[in-house]
């Protein structure tokens, strides 16, 4: 992972829901004020985004969050919809003093990023959806499980270790409740309401966020475009972190090494 001089770690409560937050102010002497926010997928945590976080934080102010019920945060008493998570995330960013950001969501996190951009268009300048779910033609628990299994077989062992460790920490009950929320969210319809530029990024060999599905999202987005990374899968932000960071920074108009 790219070295980051300073990482701040906080636990923040928003309306009784606990978030974990890691943040870096970016490099000393940075002349770019763009803020990036990374949102993880179902069952996981900030841990599998560390390589991407490091690559972006070496250039800009960056936050990565653990959503309520994930990454060791307190499990909510009731299921949260994607819309609820997005509302809480927006309130969290208000608390952190973030007034404009590039929001990056992976997998289910892409749903939250989309919904945040719909709910708070003035807060979100750019949207990056990495391996977005759930394919409208495969929006069942069984289909998602099959695709996840196929993906896992060829992901890096270190990535699988992180992901399944987080699954265990999350627990089956909360995972299942959140899965229902994930499958109920029609990202292909909600993305039509996003006014910010949208970058849809997938590993070319991703069996979860397939090319046809991602092409639909890019088409439905008023300012959407699709980018594929050859040789990578659903965890492309982990296995090709530096390349993915480069593409995201380029999309947001931020030069690498933007420091004096």
Segments from the language model and where they lie:
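Short alpha-helix in the alpha/beta-hydrolase fold that links the catalytic acid
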Residues: 187, 196, 210-219
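Acidic catalytic loop of the alpha/beta-hydrolase fold
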Residues: 204-209, 234
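Active-site loop/oxyanion-hole signature of alpha/beta-hydrolase fold enzymes
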Residues: 47, 63-104, 246
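Conserved HGGG/HGGXW glycine-rich cap/lid loop of the alpha/beta-hydrolase fold
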Residues: 23-72
């Amino acid at each position: 992972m790219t070295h980051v001089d300073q990482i701040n770690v906080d636990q923040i409560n928003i309306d009784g829901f606990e978030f974990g937050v890691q943040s870096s102010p970016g490099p000393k002497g940075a002349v770019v004020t763009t803020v990036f926010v990374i949102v993880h997928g179902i069952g996981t945590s900030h841990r599998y985004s560390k390589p991407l976080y490091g690559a972006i934080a070496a250039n800009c102010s960056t936050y990565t969050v653990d959503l309520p019920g994930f990454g060791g945060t307190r499990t909510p008493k009731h299921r949260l919809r994607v819309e609820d998570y997005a509302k809480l995330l927006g309130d969290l960013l208000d608390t952190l003093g973030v007034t404009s950001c590039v929001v990056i969501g992976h997998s289910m996190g892409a749903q939250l990023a989309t919904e945040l951009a719909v709910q708070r268009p003035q807060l979100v300048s750019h949207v990056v959806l990495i391996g977005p779910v759930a394919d409208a033609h495969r929006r069942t628990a069984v289909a998602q499980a099959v695709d996840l299994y196929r993906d896992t077989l060829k992901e890096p062992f270190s990535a699988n270790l992180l992901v399944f460790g987080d699954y265990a920490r999350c627990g089956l009950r909360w995972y299942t409740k959140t899965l229902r929320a994930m499958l109920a969210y029609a990202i292909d319809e909600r993305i039509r309401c996003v006014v910010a530029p949208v970058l849809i990024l997938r590993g070319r060999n991703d069996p979860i966020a397939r090319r046809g599905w991602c092409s639909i999202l890019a088409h439905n987005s008023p300012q959407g475009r699709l980018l594929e990374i050859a040789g990578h899968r659903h965890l492309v932000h982990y296995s090709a972190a530096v390349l993915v960071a480069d593409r995201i920074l380029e999309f947001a108009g931020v030069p690498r090494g933007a420091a004096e």
